[in-house]
């Protein structure tokens, strides 16, 4: 992708505040080590603290079906061999675009754009992304998020201000060290579960209202398995939602959020862990309730030298056969939506 729209001379994105759950993992020698998380601040970091590597002022590919500004955030803890954004992985590189420039662009294009996609790098590596998503929403735009799921706590804070998530599942949980250089599989799949849960809750108005009982336990209404004759209605008044059930009357104040859409995508290439265990990975995704899936064939353009050299030795005929097998398996897996993005 081309990163465009540089700031005026002298502009700076300022310092970077990483989230509290940065992976504590040992990278390979060839990988850049992410910054250690700073001490938690009493005040949530501002969007003005974001280190932004660049932006694409009009994108039709980063959020399916939407016209969006793609904002590329600096830094990523992973070392995926096929990464096409290698130049923006180093978290120590200062930002090139101030957040104020993003907001100025949005102000000029109100009514023309659907939203903003926060991508990277790994967008959730910087704690200011939560404020950024909130501010974009306040300006009347939708918020899309690209993530590999390495920061589940940061994701949990950002999801209430997000309308669409594109989450990369790199491999089965125990293959992440081989696939990305870091053993972040447990966190990545935890993040996937969080996206699926949030999407299910926000698809059902009843689930959008939650209340704690006297013991502090959360009572959740399940709109898919509603007992016959259950006495429950859901009323909305601004940000207040009242749930009446079996004589109980609980009111919950909650952000006025709409549905959360998502896409799970897996990138494959010859010899990749995801390629070797693709059918098993599909089964796990379906078992967890994934509805929307995209299979992506890795491209070599703009990737690290080592990956391009490796690609020269691929058996193209064998790869074409294996790729056809994976596309066929995914198309028959039962996803509500499936897309194959071939190089």
Which residues does each predicted region cover?
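Auxiliary Fe-S-binding modules of radical SAM enzymes
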Residues: 2-65, 202-205, 212-215, 223-224, ...
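Canonical Radical SAM [4Fe-4S] cluster-binding loop centered on the CxxxCxxC motif
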Residues: 50, 54, 61-97
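A secondary-structure boundary/capping signal
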Residues: 72, 119-120
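Conserved alpha-helical substructure of the radical SAM core
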Residues: 86-116
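Short glycine-enriched, charge-decorated loop/helix-capping segments at active-site entrances
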Residues: 86-93, 178-184, 307-316
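Conserved phosphate-coordination/catalytic loops
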Residues: 93-100, 149, 182-186, 317, ...
């Amino acid at each position: 992708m081309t990163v465009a729209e540089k700031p005026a001379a002298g502009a700076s994105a300022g310092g970077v505040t990483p989230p509290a759950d940065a992976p504590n993992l040992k990278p390979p020698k060839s990988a850049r080590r992410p910054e250690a998380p700073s001490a938690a601040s009493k005040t949530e970091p501002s969007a003005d603290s974001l280190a932004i590597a660049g932006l694409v002022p009009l994108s039709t590919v980063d959020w399916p079906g939407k016209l969006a500004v793609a904002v590329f955030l600096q830094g990523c803890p992973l070392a995926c061999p096929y990464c096409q954004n290698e130049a923006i992985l180093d978290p120590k590189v200062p930002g090139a675009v101030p957040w104020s420039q993003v907001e100025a662009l949005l102000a000029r294009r109100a009514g023309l754009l659907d939203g903003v996609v926060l991508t990277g790098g790994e967008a959730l590596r910087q704690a200011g992304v939560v404020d950024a998503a909130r501010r974009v929403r306040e300006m009347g735009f939708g918020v899309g998020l690209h993530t590999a799921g390495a920061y589940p706590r940061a994701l949990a804070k950002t999801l209430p201000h997000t309308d669409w998530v594109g989450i990369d599942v790199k491999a089965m949980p125990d293959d992440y060290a081989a696939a990305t250089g870091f053993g972040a599989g447990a966190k990545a799949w935890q993040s996937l579960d969080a996206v699926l849960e949030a999407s299910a809750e926000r698809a059902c108005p009843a689930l959008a209202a939650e209340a704690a009982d006297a013991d502090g336990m959360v009572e959740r209404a399940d709109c898919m398995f509603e007992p016959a004759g259950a006495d429950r209605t859901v009323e909305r008044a601004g940000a207040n939602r009242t749930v009446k059930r079996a004589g109980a009357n609980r009111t919950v104040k909650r952000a006025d959020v709409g549905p959360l859409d998502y896409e799970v995508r897996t990138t494959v290439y010859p010899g990749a862990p995801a390629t070797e265990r693709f059918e098993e990975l599909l089964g796990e995704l379906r078992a967890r309730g994934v509805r929307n899936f995209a299979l992506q064939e890795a491209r070599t353009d703009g990737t690290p030298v080592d990956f391009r050299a490796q690609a020269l030795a691929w058996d193209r005929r064998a790869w074409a056969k294996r790729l056809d097998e994976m596309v066929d398996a995914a198309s028959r897996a039962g996803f509500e939506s499936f897309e194959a993005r071939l190089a």
